[in-house]
């Protein structure tokens, strides 16, 4: 299972874990992804997406269809079937 946001394309980043003695070892920073069910009133259906928590807040503010259209314009998602 990939750790990628369906809307924004956020992925794990690579960085360093730094100890108290300033020793550095590689680690991964994972995005906070959640499986979330969204209701689409235009099609009277539900869709399940794996999205970051920041996207959940954006969807609550703008609406699911507006966020999907914006992501398609930006090119982060190619085609998402709603319904």
Curated annotation (Swiss-Prot):
This is Large ribosomal subunit protein bL28. It comes from the Bacteria. One of its GO terms (biological process) is translation. InterPro entries: Ribosomal_bL28 (IPR026569), Ribosomal_bL28/bL31-like_sf (IPR034704), Ribosomal_bL28_bact-type (IPR001383), Ribosomal_bL28_sf (IPR037147). Belongs to the bacterial ribosomal protein bL28 family. GO terms for molecular function: structural constituent of ribosome. Signal peptide: none annotated. Keywords: Ribonucleoprotein, Ribosomal protein. It holds the Pfam family Ribosomal_L28. Gene3D superfamilies: Ribosomal protein L28/L24. Transmembrane segments: none annotated. One of its GO terms (cellular component) is ribonucleoprotein complex.
